[in-house]
UniProtKB/Swiss-Prot annotation:
Note in the entry: This colicin requires TonB for its uptake.
Pfam family, one: Colicin_M
Gene this chain is encoded by: cma
Coiled coil: none
Gene3D superfamilies linked to this entry: 1.20.1440.280, Colicin M, catalytic domain
Protein name, UniProt field: Colicin-M
The entry's keywords: Antibiotic, Antimicrobial, Bacteriocin, Plasmid, TonB box
Organism, scientific name: Escherichia coli
Keyword Glycoprotein belongs to the record: no
GO biological process: defense response to bacterium; killing of cells of another organism
Function: Colicins are polypeptide toxins produced by and active against E.coli and closely related bacteria.
UniProt KW Oxidoreductase keyword: no
Length: 271
């Protein structure tokens, strides 16, 4: 059986005249206007629901019109381009809201050109899962990065085997720690889990245990690079699975995501 390979065109300024094909993202309905409406809309754009809604719209459109239809391909590239543009703004203008990044006027989202405007760095915000897909489709395998401080890691020393084993062994004193461990980001962060999933980390620090059993760990965590692909997985979550279905429809190249930087962890407890 012959396999059909579909290449989605990258977002560019050469768009057809049907209104650019951008879907409208809809926050939960709030009667009337005023501060409450603004709060709801801004909160929606900061939430994973914004990313999931966009992916659902894309999947629904493809089901109705087919993955190889030229109009479908342009609509896919246009909507992904809006997210690339927003993520770019989040990187270039730290501290702005996702809503403002998505609606930034200069350049207008409809003028986003992946070939000239794509960035190595990703923001780590709710826009990033779709941007990670864009790099798979059009990035030609070039490595990307997201700062480890921006991916919302939650690390407990008691979930790190070497630290847990020392604490439970009954010893007392101060112990240097240097160990690698696997961490499932999708267990608590649907956005990070969608494009990183399980990652390999390394912690270095000092564990101090007192005679009464109280302990304190003070250290840093760094990450090894992660490969972005669509291999079989059980830890991607609802957004990650939607990305997997979309990625399977089109040709792309897997690539490395670098996670530069470090985060500090300090926790105390009693065995």
């Amino acid at each position: 059986m012959e396999t059909l390979t579909v290449h989605a065109p990258s977002p560019s300024t050469n768009l057809p005249s049907y209104g650019n094909g951008a879907f409208s993202l809809s926050a939960p309905h709030v009667p009337g206007a005023g501060p409450l409406l603004v709060q709801v809309v801004y909160s929606f754009f900061q939430s994973p629901n914004m990313c999931l809604q966009a992916l659902t719209q894309l999947e629904d459109y493809i089901k109705k019109h087919g993955a190889s239809n030229p109009l479908t391909l342009q609509i896919i590239s246009t909507n992904i381009g809006y997210f690339c543009n927003a993520d770019r703004n989040l990187v270039l203008h730290p501290g702005i809201s996702v809503y403002d990044a998505y609606h930034f006027a200069k350049p207008a989202p409809s003028q986003y050109d992946y070939r000239s405007m794509n960035m190595k760095q990703m923001s780590g915000n709710v826009t990033t899962p779709i941007v990670a897909l864009a790099h798979y489709l059009w990035g030609n395998g070039a490595e990307r990065s997201v700062n480890i401080a921006n991916i919302g890691l939650k690390i407990s020393p008691m979930k790190i085997n070497q630290i847990k084993d020392i604490i439970k062994s009954g010893v007392v004193g101060t112990f240097p720690v240097s160990t690698k461990f696997t961490h499932a980001t999708g267990d608590y962060n649907v956005i990070t889990g969608a494009y990183l999933g399980n990652i390999t980390l390394k912690t270095e620090g000092t564990l101090t245990i007192s005679a009464n059993g109280s302990w304190t760990y003070n250290g840093v965590v760094r990450s090894y690079d992660d490969k972005y692909d669509f291999n079989a997985s059980t830890h991607r979550g609802i957004i990650g699975e939607s990305l997997t279905r979309l990625g399977a429809m089109f040709s792309g190249k897997e690539y490395q995501i670098l996670l530069p930087g470090e985060i500090h962890i300090k926790e105390s407890g009693k065995r």
